[in-house]
Design a protein with these regions (language model features):
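Single conserved hydrophobic/aromatic residue that forms the stacking wall/gate
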Residues: 115-123
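Active-site-proximal binding-pocket segments
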Residues: 1-11, 16-29
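Acidic-residue sensor for enzyme active/binding pockets
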Residues: 15, 56, 120
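C-terminal, helix-dominated tail/subdomain
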Residues: 10, 25-116
Length: 123
């Protein structure tokens, strides 16, 4: 199982790196083209985020249809998705939608850390 866990960890870290790069690119684009960053575009992004959360909720409901997974409940995953959505919105310079103050799945921070230490992969 260690191999499978490592694959999941790498996948999460890879997606985190992609997200951080896209946010940096977006912020640079807006900095260089401030006229595009208007209230209409900001509302579109916020509405798109809310719609994505609706779809995520439907997926989580389906995934947890038969009950929770040891150590996780559907409600925690939904709150985590909202927590991350708020983080991404603020990284884009937008207001939070959900106001989830504390990470409901704090162990995910360790998984999403983007820089692997060499000794972690040699065991």
């Amino acid at each position: 199982m260690k191999g499978m866990g490592q694959i999941v960890t790498w996948s999460v870290r890879d997606e985190t790196l992609h997200t951080e790069s896209a946010i940096r690119l977006f912020r640079t684009f807006v900095e260089e083209n401030p006229s595009v960053w208007n209230s209409e575009v900001q509302k579109e992004i916020i509405n798109a985020c809310a719609k994505v959360i609706e779809h995520e909720d439907a997926f989580i409901d389906l995934a947890f249809e038969l009950g929770g997974v040891e150590g996780m409940e559907a409600s925690e995953v939904k709150n985590y998705i909202r927590y991350i959505a708020d983080r991404r919105l603020t990284q884009l310079g937008l207001p939070e939608l959900f106001k989830i103050e504390k990470n409901p799945l704090p162990w995910m921070d360790a998984v999403s850390y983007t820089h692997l230490r060499a000794h972690e992969t040699k065991r």
